[in-house]
A protein has these predicted regions:
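AAA+/P-loop NTPase substrate/partner-engagement loops
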Residues: 73-98, 158-160
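Conserved catalytic/switch belt of AAA+ P-loop NTPases
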Residues: 110-112, 135-152, 162
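Flexible beta-alpha connector loops of hexameric P-loop NTPases
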Residues: 93-100, 126, 170-171
């Protein structure tokens, strides 16, 4: 049985929402042709693209086109709400996709569609599969039932095993232009175009993150303070202090993102079990509450790690700007700097550091990301990286 990691797809309008897949006309045309022409159909797809490029949105639009007959608004809404019996979506709340969840998807893939033309299995974050989990999918991807379609989503095809890549048709999404993202964000949120442009630039074209920055002045301020704090690191003491602040801020952000949902899930489960809020939980049902709490802990861990990963992405962009300045690029007119607002500080760093030191720092940021994937404590990983920022040497 698929556990709580299998979640509903995002809500969307009744018509096939191809228009919501912004700036990906070629990919949309490919999937529209596949949905309407059996000769263009492939039964296992991999949609790749940078974060925020619309991978999941495209996958759900494709599922809606495959399952719902034209004009069947009820079926369309069910698919996009994740309630259609022929639609299964896996959105993992953990750091990795479990073998249990993968096996559950494989079992469902062998059911014939009950109402629609196809049964569609969407796996978001397919890059979170470890090798053993990937192996569970191999036969289902190679020899799927005639009316089952798999759609995997990942940042890059390199994030999946060659044995998976060889069994899917890859569709690569392009990275949108910053100006186009800015116009979209301004249109969606009503934000001033200059704020939308800054947010799109800082988010490095990630539409969802750009939208958050454009609508949250506090988030913009935290990002700016974090970058300035890192530039001020001069020694081990500073590295320890700044790493602690960064992890604390990421932890608070993670709590804010998950706390309301956690409480709503707990209240819903208690109501389902017939237990009044605040009443003692009978021993017979404590295991169900414990299972929910375990799921929530995994989600909190992933949310924190995602927050730290965003910090590393921002730091990578800043020291990339330093390298650009060292190579004589980065004038505001040519649009090379991501963090233009820090240009004076970045020029000061570029003039005092060697290119080799800047590249060592960028390498250490990448190494920090790998360390976090190996479950190194975030504070320790960041401290080590910031010592490199201060000294120019890997500790």
């Amino acid at each position: 049985m698929v556990n709580s990691a299998v979640a509903a797809a995002p809500a969307a309008p009744a018509a096939v929402p191809w228009g919501a897949v912004w700036g990906q006309d070629e990919a949309v045309a490919t999937l529209q042709a596949a949905a309407s022409d059996p000769d263009s159909m492939t039964h296992a797809w991999l949609v790749t693209g940078p974060p925020g490029s619309g991978r999941s949105t495209l996958a759900y639009a494709f599922a809606a086109a495959l399952i719902a007959e034209e004009g069947d608004e009820q079926a369309m809404r069910q698919v996009l709400a994740g309630t259609h019996p022929d639609m299964t979506a896996l959105r993992t709340e953990g750091v990795i996709i479990s073998i249990k969840d993968a096996r559950s998807l494989v079992e469902r893939s062998y059911f014939s569609p009950s109402l629609g033309r196809y049964r569609v299995i969407v796996m978001e974050d397919a890059d979170r599969m470890v090798e053993r989990t990937s192996n569970v999918l191999l036969k289902a991807l190679e020899e799927p039932p005639e009316r089952t379609v798999w759609v995997l989503c990942a940042p890059s095809d390199a994030d999946l095993l060659p044995t998976i890549r060889s069994r899917v048709r890859t569709l690569r999404l392009r990275e949108p232009d910053i100006d186009d993202v800015a116009r979209l964000i301004a249109q969606r949120t009503g934000a001033d175009l200059s704020v939308a442009e800054q947010s799109a630039r800082h988010a490095q074209r990630h539409i969802g993150m750009a939208q958050r920055l454009a609508t949250d002045a506090a988030a913009r301020a935290r990002r700016d303070a974090m970058l300035r704090g890192v530039l001020a690191v001069r020694g081990v003491g500073d590295a320890v202090e700044v790493a602690g602040r960064v992890v604390a801020a990421a932890t608070e952000d993670a709590k804010a993102l998950t706390a309301e949902r956690d409480e709503a899930e707990r209240s819903s489960l208690l109501r389902t079990l017939g237990i009044a809020e605040g009443a003692a939980v009978p021993p017979a049902v404590r295991s169900q509450l414990s299972a929910l709490e375990d799921d929530q802990k995994r989600r909190a861990t992933r949310s924190l790690r995602d927050g730290i990963d965003r910090v590393l992405t921002d730091l990578q962009s800043m020291f990339r700007d330093v390298v650009m300045l060292q190579f004589g690029r980065g004038a505001p007119a040519d649009g090379d700097l991501i963090n233009r607002e820090l240009e004076p500080e970045l020029r000061a760093v570029a003039s005092t550091w060697s290119v080799e030191r800047s590249l060592v720092v960028l390498d250490q940021i990448a190494e920090t990301r790998r360390n976090l994937e190996q479950n190194v404590a975030p504070t320790l990983a960041l401290e080590s990286m910031l010592v490199t920022v201060a000294s120019g040497r890997i500790p």
